[in-house]
UniProtKB/Swiss-Prot annotation:
Protein's GO biological process: intracellular protein transport
General function of this protein: Acts as a component of the retromer cargo-selective complex (CSC). The CSC is believed to be the core functional component of retromer or respective retromer complex variants acting to prevent missorting of selected transmembrane cargo proteins into the lysosomal degradation pathway. Retromer mediates retrograde transport of cargo proteins from endosomes to the trans-Golgi network (TGN).
Record keywords, A-Z: Cytoplasm, Endosome, Membrane, Protein transport, Transport
Gene3D superfamilies: 2.60.40.640
Keyword match Protein transport: yes
Protein name: Vacuolar protein sorting-associated protein 26A
Gene field: vps26a
Length: 326
């Protein structure tokens, strides 16, 4: 697989071909428009190497330039402030000194053991992307083309992964106990738990478990929170009775969530909550949120050959009181 730039007028095309393009895995990412793009997948510490091909399609053409370079860029862009993009990685390789091209040329490049500290992410209000940027410098207008890559951050099994157990209720009306088997789940995991009814004096019509994603961008008064319901799991439809216990099994693999991201470069965070929702016969809704951590488990081949490590944030998941609660 190669990246193809398209035409720069009638003069030339630019191609970027990775050295391991035949064997490197491709991953998908959903854009802000909802389209799915496929790009080569990299991990933190991996080198990025290949060739830049400047291809003349018509003989006899000439291209004067002030130099040719390639950059490896990691960038955060806030959609509500597109003029203020932040580059947290920028590595440059000069491919050619100023001169003139009269025929097709190719240039080798290699960025050794590149630090890629964050996961690629496209959300409601922010995008974190990695890309190769080829620039042919000219007197008037540079020829520039960008080629996106995808980066996944891998994590080891957490040293501590306590279950979540909590009793909640409305005084003299409803008292329930809920339990989830873990507080940290990998992206293909299964959330297992149970709901136990200790006291039921209101008529519950419906109960469901939601996986809520909260994307927080900005700092201080300019903070924006975007909330999305990633998954819904119907626990019961009908009235429970005292002493009843209802099991929970929510398969994360079917919903393709991202890992939890905390304070990424002081620009944004992505947090996940389990939201227990009860609806009574008068259509009143009761909520209880509990934060969980989602992490990306390394594939078996990567675990065997790579000494990777992602530290989990020291903060334990917390219950949320941002909505009306039980």
């Amino acid at each position: 697989m190669s990246f193809l730039s398209g035409f720069f007028g009638p003069i030339c095309e630019i191609e970027v071909v990775l050295n391991d393009a035949d064997t490197r895995k491709v991953s998908e990412i959903k854009t802000e428009e909802g389209k799915v793009e496929k790009h080569f997948l990299f991990y933190d510490g991996e080198s990025v190497a290949g060739k830049v091909n400047i291809v003349f399609r018509q003989p006899g053409k000439r291209l004067e330039h002030q130099g040719i370079r390639i950059e490896f860029v990691g960038q955060i862009e806030l959609f509500n402030d597109k003029s203020n993009t932040h580059e947290f990685v920028n590595l440059v390789k000069e491919l050619a000194l100023p001169g003139e091209l009269t025929q097709s040329r190719n240039y080798d490049f290699e960025f050794m053991q590149v630090e890629k500290p964050y996961e690629s992410y496209i959300g409601a209000n922010v995008r974190l992307r990695y890309f190769l940027k080829v620039t042919i410098v000219r007197r008037l207008t540079d020829l520039v083309k960008e080629y996106d890559l995808i980066v996944h951050q891998l994590a080891t099994y957490p040293d501590v992964n306590n279950s979540i157990k909590m009793e909640v209720g409305i005084e003299d009306c409803l008292h329930i106990e809920f339990e989830y088997n873990k507080s940290k789940y990998h992206l293909k995991d299964v959330i297992v738990g149970k709901i136990y009814f200790l006291l039921v004096r209101i008529k519950i019509q419906h109960m469901e478990l939601q996986l809520i994603k909260k994307e927080i961008t900005g700092i201080g008064p300019s903070t924006t929170t975007e909330t999305e319901t990633v998954a819904k799991y119907e626990i019961m439809d009908g009235a429970p009775v005292k002493g009843e216990s209802i099991p929970i099994r929510l398969f994360l693999a079917g919903y393709d969530p991202t890992p939890t991201m905390r304070d990424v470069n002081k620009k944004f965070s992505v947090r996940y909550f389990l939201n227990l929702v009860l609806v009574d016969e008068e259509d009143r809704r009761y909520f209880k949120q509990q934060e969980i951590i989602l992490w990306r488990k390394a594939p078996e081949k990567i675990r065997k050959r790579t000494n990777f490590h992602q530290r989990f944030e020291p903060q334990e998941p917390q219950a949320s009181a941002e909505e009306p609660e039980i």
